[in-house]
């Protein structure tokens, strides 16, 4: 019996070694196959230097948008110049380009493979924020070696919130300003990435399905979707290139609704208030605000919890009437329904409690929607497969904000992921971009395009 055990043990050990060897061989083969697939894409890719030069050309164009009045379309000369430049660049690459009267630049690239595959659409925006100075942007390219970055007019310190990412960026190529303006990486990073993709897929031999691109104006004033033409841009899988950092992918976001209400008052002497029908609009609007449930205030929510916030109160010219604006944000549609019920009941209570105050809804409706509701089922598996090939570790997020893709969803377009683009400290004079993160986004998108046609 002991002899039998020894013989079985030797076979067992031999079998274990064989299995381990087989697993190791499979692992090496898998790694090699993945690397080979990635190299297939990279052999068509432009260089980091070419992307940097393109980016520097784009940030030299001051393309700030502005907040319009109700009766004007906010197209600026800088955005027109940027749109003209993008359209010209795409035409030089022999792409099918349309520059619309509203300033959108559409690029359509037909499939060059026989089988039917979903259309991938990629979007970014050409404007930069009007909230921070942007005249005379002076970019500096720096190979970061650690420590404080001297901008000339201020610093970026790794020990401050503005420098929180720097410790992970040693050895990377950073582009920053002189500290008096923004850089414009939000979203000139995206513009450079998209144009680099257009250049690459136009090269002979790069196989791809149908591709659509759009460079939007007015995103930073919340109007990227206002005049988009879905006859030119109507993809199955939508990707928005506008997130910060080098790993983030937003796969869901707040749905945003807004409500603006006017409370019309009538002032009389308090002694005769009952007889003369005092309409105390200030008391009415205060009651409306006070009845908002405290557990749904923004400061009491996190993660995928939504909120209600009455945020802007304005006294009108008659001094006795007021408008109040309320925002609601949610991920879950059921929570959104509950928030709307609360607001309706709240307004009804105010009407009954202040019968002489006229309560008028001036504006209400959807501002942007959670992309998760309508996202193509292949979107997330596709980006995961591409990330595996590129050996990029992604950080999937539920974004407590809106995105360009979320704005576009209100126009009937499918929900889209938002992808990192190498931006940091956007909307501030401490803004900087990271070239290697931009390049990672570019390679990842190319790999997605390659992956889906296979």
Residue ranges and their predicted role:
Residues 283-300, 307-309, 358, 366-418:
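Active-site-adjacent substrate-binding region
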Residues 166, 172-182, 218-338, 348, ...:
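Midchain, well-structured core segments that form catalytic/ion-binding scaffolds
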Residues 41, 46-77, 175-176, 424-428:
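N-terminal capping segment at the start of a domain
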Residues 318, 394-447:
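Zn-dependent metallopeptidase/amidohydrolase metal-coordination segment
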């Amino acid at each position: 019996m002991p002899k039998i055990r020894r013989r079985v043990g030797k076979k067992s050990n031999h079998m274990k070694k064989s299995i381990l060897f087989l697993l190791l061989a499979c692992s090496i083969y898998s790694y090699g196959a993945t690397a080979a697939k990635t190299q297939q894409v990279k052999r068509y890719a432009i260089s980091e230097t070419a992307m940097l030069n393109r980016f520097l050309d784009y940030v030299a164009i001051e393309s700030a948008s502005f907040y319009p009045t109700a009766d004007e379309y906010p197209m600026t000369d800088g955005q027109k110049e940027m749109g003209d430049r993008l359209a010209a660049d795409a035409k030089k690459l022999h792409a099918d380009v349309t520059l619309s009267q509203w300033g959108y630049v559409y690029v359509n690239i037909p499939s060059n493979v026989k089988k039917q595959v979903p259309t991938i659409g990629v979007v970014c925006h050409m404007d930069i924020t009007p909230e921070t100075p942007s005249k005379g942007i002076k970019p500096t390219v720096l190979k970061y070696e650690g420590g404080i970055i001297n901008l000339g007019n201020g610093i970026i310190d790794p020990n401050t919130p503005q420098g929180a990412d720097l410790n992970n960026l040693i050895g990377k190529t950073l582009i920053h300003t002189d500290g008096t303006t923004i850089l414009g990486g939000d979203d000139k990073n995206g513009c450079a990435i998209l144009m680099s993709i257009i250049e690459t897929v136009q090269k002979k031999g790069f196989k791809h399905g149908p591709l659509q691109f759009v460079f939007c104006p007015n995103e930073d004033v919340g109007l990227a979707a206002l005049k988009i033409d879905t006859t030119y841009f109507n993809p199955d899988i939508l990707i928005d290139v506008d997130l910060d950092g080098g790993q983030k992918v937003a796969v869901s976001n707040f749905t945003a609704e807004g409500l603006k209400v006017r409370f019309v008052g009538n002032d009389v002497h308090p002694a005769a208030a009952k007889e003369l029908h005092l309409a105390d609009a200030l008391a009415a609007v205060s009651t409306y605000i006070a009845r908002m449930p405290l557990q749904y205030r923004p400061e009491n929510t996190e993660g995928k919890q939504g909120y209600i916030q009455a945020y802007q109160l304005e006294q009108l010219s008659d001094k006795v009437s007021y408008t109040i604006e309320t925002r609601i944000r949610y991920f879950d549609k059921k929570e959104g329904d509950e928030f709307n019920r609360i607001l309706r009941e709240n307004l009804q209570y105010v009407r009954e409690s202040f019968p002489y105050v006229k309560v008028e809804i001036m504006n209400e409706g959807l501002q942007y929607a959670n992309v998760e509701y309508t996202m193509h089922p292949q979107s997330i598996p596709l980006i995961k497969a591409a990330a595996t090939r590129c050996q990029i570790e992604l950080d999937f997020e539920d974004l407590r904000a809106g995105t360009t893709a979320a704005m576009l969803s209100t126009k009937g377009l499918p929900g889209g992921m938002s992808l990192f683009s190498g931006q940091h400290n956007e909307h501030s004079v401490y803004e900087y971009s990271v070239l290697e993160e931009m390049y990672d986004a570019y390679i990842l998108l190319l790999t997605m395009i390659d992956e889906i046609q296979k």
